[in-house]
């Protein structure tokens, strides 16, 4: 097993959602051809008024051209004319939101057989696709030098059809409205699959906690919660952690909420166990991914023992995914971050993984390149572990969205990968998923495979309301049962409609929410 001698290919920055690259590139005017087209449009449109700066006519014309190009790929393969029209309308509203449109298309394609059998659910899908509420706000804070810094905060309260909004907070420079909407949209169906009464939401900020002092992070979190507290409560919206939001940030956020509202309630999950948190919450997402694929393997008469696994990421999800894989007898070959990856030719030992966990616990911003081992090989240049030239049985993308593109998928297929289990949210592009399906790889989508995190968040909500704490064994037992229920829920529609596991998960999650919306009336 060795890293390749040449860098892997990847989509250019800004085109990480290949389903809509032409539309987005067109909208942003990134190519010479489209510049020429824009000039032609300008010649047929009113020119900008130098006094008023009126770009309206030009912007409208360019947007129409972008829409025409984008919708060609968006509706490809969709036969239902009403569904095609709906996707076109959604795209026309916000053509620049490529991550969101990627998520909507993926769900829409898988729901086609449902709309054929139950056409009355298509208007409900139209309602579900539009978020109930989108909140954006300014977050001002002082750095350690006394300088004023300003970031943007978001909370997308997408659907409360089956329970209060539930979803994490992400602090990362890449955060924007498109990413928040895609994550909140996915959260609806993920939460539905857990069988717990939770709606879908997501939030965060473009603030980057990396490189910030504890005092700076505290001041930012306090400013962020000063606005967010107006929109959340334990019966309305219950945020949790996500990328960039761990136990430290949750503590600062909870403290500020309590300080302002004078209420000690379970308004956040992922709290420390000293003040209302649950056992296994940090481990839950990574553990859940392993438990999910274990159910898939059991159905095939197999087990995880001896399976060679590639894991991306080095945060909580990746660490605890690797931890449970080792407990189950699997071989973990890699961990990674945005700068590169490290791999152990014979697999990580428990002691080596513990060294990574200790390093990250001491400094959450530590790079995976800082991991030291006599046997480890580090590959930088922002390369990804999917390029490793070795036999692979299971891939666990646990880093971020769209980390596996079409080329990466081809490499996994070449190296014998049989399963892709998503620990991150939407880590595979639509083109990569198409490659999986064509090659016969069993694809375990994030909305099912990584639902362990929100499942234990739901269990934390229950413990808070009941004013009790379950033991580690009790929580793990409940998590194992929930992941089994999620797998069974996805397999039911998969068999009924003769579709793959990913489509089955979408159908199961959607129909539960749609039936709830229908019962509550069109509002």
From Swiss-Prot:
Region (Disordered): 26-50
Active-site annotation: 202
CC terms in the record's Gene Ontology section: chloroplast; cytosol
Annotated EC: 1.4.1.4
The organism's place on the tree of life at top rank: Eukaryota
GO BP field: glutamate biosynthetic process
Catalytic activity: L-glutamate + NADP(+) + H2O = 2-oxoglutarate + NH4(+) + NADPH + H(+)
PROSITE patterns: GLFV_DEHYDROGENASE
Compartments where found: Plastid, Chloroplast
PTM note: The N-termini of the alpha and the beta chains are blocked.
Factors inducing expression: By ammonium.
Top enzyme category: oxidoreductase
Matching InterPro entries: Aminoacid_DH-like_N_sf, Glu/Leu/Phe/Val/Trp_DH, Glu/Leu/Phe/Val/Trp_DH_C, Glu/Leu/Phe/Val/Trp_DH_dimer, Glu/Leu/Phe/Val_DH_AS, Glu_Leu_Phe_Val_DH, NAD(P)-bd_dom_sf, NAD_bind_Glu_DH
Keywords: Chloroplast, NADP, Oxidoreductase, Plastid
Quaternary structure note: Homo- and heterohexamer of alpha and beta subunits. Both subunits are encoded by the same gene.
NCBIfam families to which the protein is assigned, alphabetical: PRK09414.1
Protein name: NADP-specific glutamate dehydrogenase
